[in-house]
């Protein structure tokens, strides 16, 4: 029935094509639609016994197209359909690509010929022409050449090897989210059986656990490969759980330095993992240097700083800034309850106050710049906001200043030989105003008041603080903080520490010049000392503070000075450090 016959285009065309259905993927724009395509000099329609109408195919003389041949079995015979046109006649069996070359389609069709289509996509370059195809009786096959658009194929990114863990179906599934501060705000439901160590559930008990188990979302103190409670203690590097702001106290005496051995542990905000790998159906776990595994490899998030101060309740610091860590939890092995989020690492700028700890006075707005300006570093987020009126009594209030002193302040401060002063420093030393306003000093000053230049005197030391007392009021004892401030940056208060340079003439003071002993939490809030027994490093006589005096920071209890506050006068240089 299906005799071999040759059908050619009746028009002298270089290329012919037929109209037929396409079977591209459902994403293809050609899917389930009649597409008009062309193939180089080919006849596409083969008919078997039944009569079929004349097919009209639109031809675009185009660039060479890739043609693919479809074989359709037609009952029992095979038809060789050779397309002949006024081009180089060349017979190609099955697949081939030729520009303006005839190709042979080997068509076989089964009983009721089902059309199969292969695709070639070409770019139109000339106007569309028409050619007619003659059909013999019997079934026919419409073959269309179209190449499915490549853009429909979106390659899936290769999965990155990540650490995986698998949460128990109904045990300790996280309910909550990771905030931008990398604090897991939420709870693990039924935190009795945690991510199990072997086959047993370890409850969160006050003892050290030999194998890590995540529980009750409390701050945890990691010791080697175990997580243990540290509610009243400080979090060390790498511990996980409700991260509050942790600062790296390099050499301050507020907190003891963190243990050296804990530096080796990976610090990550990912939940603590079981130490053994999860099911073999997942990707193999990659041990992170022999330490407990996480869902993702623990990031060395440098800004997770630690101190060993007792933790304070996060009362009013809801919007914290400062050190953050990066979280990446993405893996088919991870439970879906832990949303893959990314917590950007934000290196805290030096000396920037946290805006969430309440309105605080602009420290340094009332001080003549005794020290070079260093970028503000963030106050600890867990430090409750302190206002000037909330801070302890300042020495000015303990020692009532004489009335005429505030008005005589500009005269002794007139500088006959001005010298460059360091940039403003956010300190809590109430020092120099053009006209001190005693009534307004207890109130917070968020905006620094403009001062008429740096006030220096040709005397051995410039007036650095308000000349409000005929004599400095020695502080009998340091004013204790209401509560220990667990961060390197204490809650700032307006300290009006006496200075030997109060009056028009510097007054040398013996001993500590009436200044109180440094408290570990007030290293940055005290006025600099000057005198024979204090910080007259720039003076030999020690009778006062001169223009070239060096005002180093007080030494902390651990022997380390506040490196972020080491300053000098004209001859000094500013040092800075992260906290």
Curated annotation (Swiss-Prot):
InterPro entries on file: Keratinocyte_PR
GO CC terms: cytoplasm; extracellular exosome
Record has Mitochondrion as a keyword: no
Tissue specificity comment: Expressed in the upper layer of epidermis and psoriasis (at protein level). Expressed in the upper layer of epidermis and psoriasis.
Cellular localization per UniProt: Cytoplasm
GO annotation, biological process: desmosome organization; establishment of skin barrier; inflammatory response
Record flagged with keyword Repeat: no
Annotated region described as Disordered, given as residue ranges: 526-579
Stretches with biased composition (Basic and acidic residues): 551-561
Conditions for induction: By calcium and in psoriatic lesions.
Alphabetically ordered keywords of this record: Cytoplasm, Phosphoprotein
UniProt-listed PANTHER family: KERATINOCYTE PROLINE-RICH PROTEIN, KERATINOCYTE PROLINE-RICH PROTEIN-RELATED
Name the record gives this protein: Keratinocyte proline-rich protein
Organism listed in the record: Homo sapiens (Human)
Gene (UniProt): KPRP
């Amino acid at each position: 029935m299906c005799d071999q016959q040759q059908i050619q285009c009746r028009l002298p065309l270089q290329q012919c094509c037929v109209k037929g259905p396409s079977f591209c993927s459902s994403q293809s724009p050609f899917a389930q639609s009649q597409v008009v395509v062309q193939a180089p000099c080919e006849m596409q329609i083969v008919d078997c016994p039944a009569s079929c109408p004349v097919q009209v195919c639109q031809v675009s003389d185009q660039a060479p197209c890739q043609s693919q041949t479809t074989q359709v079995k037609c009952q029992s015979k095979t038809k060789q359909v050779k397309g002949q046109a006024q081009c180089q006649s060349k017979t190609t069996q099955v697949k081939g690509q030729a520009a303006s070359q005839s190709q042979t389609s080997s068509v076989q069709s089964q009983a009721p010929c089902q059309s199969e289509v292969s695709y070639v996509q070409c770019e139109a370059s000339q106007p569309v022409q028409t050619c007619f195809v003659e059909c013999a009786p019997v079934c026919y096959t419409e073959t269309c050449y179209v190449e499915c658009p490549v853009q429909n194929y979106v390659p899936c990114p290769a999965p990155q090897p990540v650490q995986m863990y698998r949460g128990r179906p109904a045990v300790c599934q996280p309910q909550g989210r990771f905030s931008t501060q990398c604090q897991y705000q939420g709870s693990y439901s039924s935190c009795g059986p945690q991510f199990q160590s072997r086959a047993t559930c370890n409850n969160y008990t006050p003892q050290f656990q030999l194998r890590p188990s995540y529980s009750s979302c409390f701050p945890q103190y990691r010791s080697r490969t175990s997580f243990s409670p540290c509610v009243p203690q400080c979090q060390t590097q790498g511990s996980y759980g409700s991260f509050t702001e942790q600062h790296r106290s390099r050499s301050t005496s507020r907190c003891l330095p963190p243990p050296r051995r804990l530096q080796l542990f990976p610090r990550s905000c990912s939940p603590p993992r079981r130490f053994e790998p999860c099911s073999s159906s997942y990707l193999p776990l990659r041990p992170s240097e022999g330490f407990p595994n996480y869902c993702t490899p623990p990031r060395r998030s440098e800004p997770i700083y630690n101190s060993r101060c007792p933790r304070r309740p996060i009362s009013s610091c809801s919007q914290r800034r400062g050190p953050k860590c990066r979280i990446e939890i993405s893996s088919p092995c991870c439970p879906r309850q832990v949303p893959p989020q990314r917590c950007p690492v934000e290196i805290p700028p030096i000396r920037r106050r946290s805006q969430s700890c309440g309105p605080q006075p602009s420290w340094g707005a009332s001080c003549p710049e005794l020290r070079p300006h260093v970028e503000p570093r963030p106050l600890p987020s867990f430090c409750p906001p302190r206002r000037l009126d909330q801070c302890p009594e300042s020495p000015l209030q303990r020692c009532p200043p004489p009335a005429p002193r505030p008005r005589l302040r500009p005269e002794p401060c007139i500088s006959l030989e001005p010298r460059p002063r360091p940039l403003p420093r956010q300190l809590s030393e109430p020092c120099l105003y053009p006209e001190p306003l005693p009534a307004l000093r207890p109130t917070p000053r968020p905006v620094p008041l403009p001062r008429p230049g740096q006030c220096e005197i040709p005397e051995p030391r410039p007036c650095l603080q308000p000349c409000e007392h005929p004599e400095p009021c020695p502080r009998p004892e340091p004013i204790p903080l209401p509560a220990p401030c667990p961060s390197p940056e204490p809650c700032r208060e307006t300290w009006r520490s006496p200075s030997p340079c109060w009056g028009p003439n510097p007054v040398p003071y013996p001993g500590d010049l009436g200044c109180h002993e440094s408290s570990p939490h007030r290293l940055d809030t005290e006025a600099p000392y000057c005198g024979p027994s204090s910080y007259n490093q720039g003076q030999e006589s020690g009778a006062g503070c001169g223009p070239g005096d060096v005002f180093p920071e007080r030494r902390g209890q651990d022997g380390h000075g506040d490196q972020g506050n080491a300053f000098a006068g004209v001859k000094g240089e500013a040092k800075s450090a992260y906290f």
